[in-house]
Regions:
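Positively charged, helix-rich recognition surfaces that bind polyanionic ligands
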Residues: 2-188
Length: 188
């Protein structure tokens, strides 16, 4: 997109080398369930704060820029200008998503000692779904990797559940497995 970046590498010693311990309070643990429209739903049935489907919000302007690019003649200066405008706008969308992820993951690791997340087969989910664009827009794997990275610097642990664990069918209080619940909008 026509921008230059500088990278600086530093080596530092961690001051916080104490052993991670769990206090045992129920309000210090949270589970996150993936949601294509709201990023996640936590174990208290709350959706992510300030989440907006970034690419879906900007799809009209994105389509306009893509049309402008496709209408220009290949090899022309106007095509290069249109390509740069499109690249800058896509970078803007990515920066908004990254900024939201950084702020939300930091809020979560500062607020909770244990964060449970589900491991998903996103490639398989995107292959057979009409929600593939939403799955891609949420960028769940990047969100989880940021959680893991930030939890190393705070007194927090990230626990991943198995890919095939029926977390949506289990009661969070008593552990009863309701096999009749296949509708993912029912989260009780």
């Amino acid at each position: 997109s026509g921008r230059c970046y500088a990278s600086i590498c530093c080596v530092y010693e961690s001051v916080n080398d104490k052993e991670k311990s769990f206090s045992g309070n129920d309000n210090q643990a949270i589970g996150l369930d993936f949601s294509p429209s709201k990023a996640y739903i936590d174990s208290y049935n709350q959706s992510a704060l300030n989440y907006a489907p970034f690419k879906q919000e900007a799809k009209k302007h994105l389509a306009h820029l893509q049309r402008n690019l496709s209408r220009t003649k290949k090899g022309s200066k106007n095509r290069e200008k249109a390509r740069l405008r499109l690249a800058k706008f896509e970078e803007h969308i990515a920066n908004k998503r990254r900024d939201w992820m950084e702020k939300e993951t930091l809020r979560l690791v500062r607020s909770y000692e244990v964060i449970g997340v589900e491991t998903l087969n996103l490639k398989g989910m995107m292959r057979f779904s009409h929600n593939a664009k939403n799955y891609n827009d949420v960028s769940w794997s990047k969100f989880v990797s940021l959680l893991e990275w930030k939890s190393a610097f705070h007194n927090c642990s990230v626990v991943k559940s198995d890919k095939w664990f029926a977390s949506s069918q289990l009661c969070s209080h008593c552990g009863f497995k309701n096999k009749a619940v296949k509708n993912l909008s029912v989260r009780k």
